[in-house]
Amino acid sequence: MHLVGYAWLREAMQLSAFPLHLPAIVQPVTRLKKIGQTLAVPSAIAPAADDLLGHVLFALKHEGVNLAILAQALPKIPVAALENALQEAPNGIYIRKACYLREAFTGEEVPQHAPVRGAFVPLFDPKRYVTRPGTRNSRWRVEFNGLGDVSYCATVERTARLIELQEHDILGRAKAFMESLPPVMMDRAINWAYLHETKDSFAIEREAPNEDKSRRFIHLLRQAHERQPLTEEYLVALQNATVSNPYDLAAAFRHEQNHLAGALQGAAGVTYVPPPPELCRELMEHLMQFANEAPNQIDPLVAAGIISFGFVFLHPFMDGNGRLSRFLIHQALCRAGALENGLLLPVSVAMKREERLYLEALQDFSRPTRDFWDVQWIDFGKLAFDFRGDAAIYRYWDATDCVIFTMEMAQHALEVELREEAAFLECYDAVYRAVDERFDIRGSDLANLVMMCLTNDGFVSKHRRKQYQYTVPTEVFDYIEQTAQQVLSEKHAAQEKRQ
């Protein structure tokens, strides 16, 4: 048994690439099939062990498109090898793709002895990948239909889970749900969403924003509905509005190396190193172009996941990247026109609840990337960084799991956060109205007691009874409890009936 395709190229050519999720391995089988975490390959169709181009063509045909490996492997294959293969199959789909990519990566032409004929072929199979309208190369009759361009491109595979989430129509259901609410209730639910999206986006960063910082971030969230295109100037303004330390305010994308660190000291504590400054600034141009186009070309939630995680992986600022990356989910959905009437899906609230899964999604990229950096401790607060990898690991990345996580959080934000808050507001109104009609209680006291009772499973605690004993009669406490328990019981019964 031996490796073939991308796994062989990665190992034999010692390429800077992440381990494959499904390496192709020759096994005693009669046809290609998935066995466990490998792609079992019959020896009859396996390329020769030393045939570089053969492994590239095998991979393109049977394993999809891995640009991170192809960008490093194809430039090392002599032009003559591609020229000979092209003569044998002048209109072959996979040799055309290989020639097209090699020219794109190197700028060096592969000679054609006759013009390529036949229909245009998509570089990415639309049945396997999420794709978008592409740019056509008439020389090789190949259409680049990836999620980005040849210099920066994410891939999203159409897995069963992704398809399931898309069929759920999360954004359509969110719109329908909000439209089903009375106007006043809808406004209150939206205001709650903005407030808690702000609070939990900061909480993920282990920060509690003051009132001024919260107000500024809420203003930014509302501003996203203006659909302003992403530019360096706009992102700098956003960063300045979300960072309070004057020494961390950016004037442009970073010109120095940054990193993320854990609890350990020195180099051992460095958990992620983003791309070097020059590469970061280049890739941000491509990401911003994608962000300004893709939300109107593909599923907005798919675009939002790529933009958000792509931004945080590039880390273009020295501080504020995390909360800006979550803001960009909202910005992408607004740009697509998917959130109307000021609607916001509080994805940060969902992410805070699922913080472990959020960290895992980030670490799927950050951990293997860290292996390509040599970090040396110089002094406290001073580290030296030496990138030993290839820029391809930052240029081309698999965003499938990041997109699925983003969609799951959007679904959670709708089905749990927004629906629960709307139900809570409905219960609150019912209890408040019933008590207010029967007793003459100060409005602020009644509002606080109803709120505290509902969040305490229908009971007013001894502490609260004592706190309000001189302004609220005992029978009012009892009636609040009685009414709250009845309203909560009716709500639970209605939920069970719907299920």
Language model: regions and residue ranges:
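FIC/Doc superfamily catalytic core
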Residues: 1-318, 323-499
